[in-house]
Amino acid sequence: MQVHERSHTGGHTFQCNHGNEKKAPAAGKVHSEGGSARMSLLILVSIFLCAASVMFLVYKYFPQLSEEELEKIKVPRDMDDAKALGKVLSKYKDTFYVEVLVAYFTTYIFLQTFAIPGSIFLSILSGFLYPFPLALFLVCLCSGLGASFCYLLSYLVGRPVVYKYLSDKAIKWSQQVERHRDHLINYIIFLRITPFLPNWFINITSPVINVPLKVFFLGTFIGVAPPSFVAIKAGTTLYQLTTAGEAVSWNSVIILMVLAVLSILPAIFQKKLKQKFE
């Protein structure tokens, strides 16, 4: 016996078979899916190379650095890398304000677009380099734009990956999205504040399960603010930190939990009122 779960997403259908029977896929279908995956990979690599070329141009017009400083200009992988990078950027920030800002902006968006680790250290660095209001706006904007570009990338070429490797998880999240469809922006904000779903998973599956881009961007822009607040505040004491984990205290965790609950309260009240009047 077969039980089918379906989630219709923009002309595409998720389908899972539960049971002991498994039908062998038709040869034509396998060939078609293989060709689609190869084409998607080719497009993805082309887009990545174009983005990498933009990054190269940005750093080509960066201020001339010494060999020692050039070694420190890299995506931070730990707190020591972040401190070294912060030292170099702070040296040139006042004289080459626009160049440093553009380099920070493009790097952050590049990492977010291609789901490359390291943006947490850039969030911490923003608190070290810039005044708090500018740093918070910059991180929220970069996160919103980078996540939206990742969304668009998934919309263009990521569907075969989602269908092949993440279909079960995507079906479950699709069901959650449908339950929260009337207050979707609150749900996206809640997910961005909390660690229940990885950000990369939210980014690449959202277009497949019909989360509107506008709602996705606004929910991300607002939702990343509370955790970014914590990282930016930690950045003001950058040289006292030894790991990224030290940026998060129990007080900040409690505050994030409270904000997460507040973000979903309007949806809960709306649902209760709707049930009452029905």
UniProtKB/Swiss-Prot annotation:
The keyword Endoplasmic reticulum is annotated on this UniProt entry: yes
InterPro entries: TM41A/B, VTT_dom
Signal peptide: none
GO biological process, one term: nervous system development
Membrane topology of this protein: Multi-pass membrane protein
Keyword Transport: yes
Coiled coil: none
Function, in words: Phospholipid scramblase involved in lipid homeostasis and membrane dynamics processes. Has phospholipid scramblase activity toward cholesterol and phosphatidylserine, as well as phosphatidylethanolamine and phosphatidylcholine. Required for autophagosome formation: participates in early stages of autophagosome biogenesis at the endoplasmic reticulum (ER) membrane by reequilibrating the leaflets of the ER as lipids are extracted by atg2 (atg2a or atg2b) to mediate autophagosome assembly.
Name assigned to this protein: Transmembrane protein 41B
Organism: Xenopus laevis
